[in-house]
């Protein structure tokens, strides 16, 4: 559960992401594919090379979904229900991959916003991404 302080930290941090959400999403995906090569198995039809239009497009989807989640911190299950259905029933993504992408997102955010990435903000963003991952895997049962 996100505390009021966590919610403030997440909203403030995400306000600095702003228009870069898609770019950061794509960078985090690239970082994940390079650091955890087994994650590529879910994207056999993608060109996974650096700067790929497909990775950029998927990164935008990731960024947009997280922006939506930030706007609905009090109702993540409602805000992410359709995305949860997609990942559970159609894509069948192994839940561990959400943790890997979350880690890569944290690295990307820290790299681009070092002055704002305090230990408290890091902890709040980690809790937020963990909650998002939990919601996205909640329908796997």
From Swiss-Prot:
InterPro entries: Globin, Globin-like_sf, Globin/Proto, Hemoglobin_a-typ, Hemoglobin_oxygen_transport, Hemoglobin_pi
Pfam families, alphabetized: Globin
UniProt modified residues of type Phosphothreonine: 8, 108, 134, 137
GO biological process, one term: hydrogen peroxide catabolic process
A GO term, aspect molecular function: heme binding
Top-level taxonomic group: Eukaryota
Residue span(s) of domain Globin: 1-141
Keyword annotations from UniProtKB, A to Z: Heme, Iron, Metal-binding, Oxygen transport, Phosphoprotein, Transport
GO CC, one annotated term: blood microparticle
Modified positions (N6-succinyllysine) in chain numbering: 7, 11, 40
Sites bearing Phosphoserine, chain numbering: 3, 35, 49, 102, 124, 138
Ligand binding (O2): 58
Residues where Phosphotyrosine is found: 24
Alphabetical list of Gene3D superfamilies matching this protein: Globins
Binding site for heme b: 87
Tissue specificity note: Red blood cells.
Similarity comment: Belongs to the globin family.
Function: Involved in oxygen transport from the lung to the various peripheral tissues.
Quaternary structure, from the entry: Heterotetramer of two alpha chains and two beta chains.
Protein name in UniProt: Hemoglobin subunit alpha
Organism classification: Eukaryota, Metazoa, Chordata, Craniata, Vertebrata
């Amino acid at each position: 559960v996100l505390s009021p302080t966590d919610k403030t930290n997440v909203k403030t941090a995400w306000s600095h992401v702003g228009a870069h959400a898609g770019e950061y999403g794509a960078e985090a995906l690239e970082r994940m594919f390079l650091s955890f090569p087994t994650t590529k198995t879910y994207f056999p039809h993608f060109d996974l090379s650096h700067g790929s239009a497909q990775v950029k497009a998927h990164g935008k989807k990731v960024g947009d979904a997280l922006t939506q989640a930030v706007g609905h911190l009090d109702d993540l299950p409602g805000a992410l229900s359709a995305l949860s259905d997609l990942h559970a029933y159609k894509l069948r993504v192994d839940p561990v991959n959400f943790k890997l992408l979350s880690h890569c997102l944290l690295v990307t955010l820290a790299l681009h916003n070092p002055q704002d990435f305090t230990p408290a903000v890091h902890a709040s963003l980690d809790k937020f991404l963990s909650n998002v991952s939990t919601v996205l895997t909640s329908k796997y049962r």
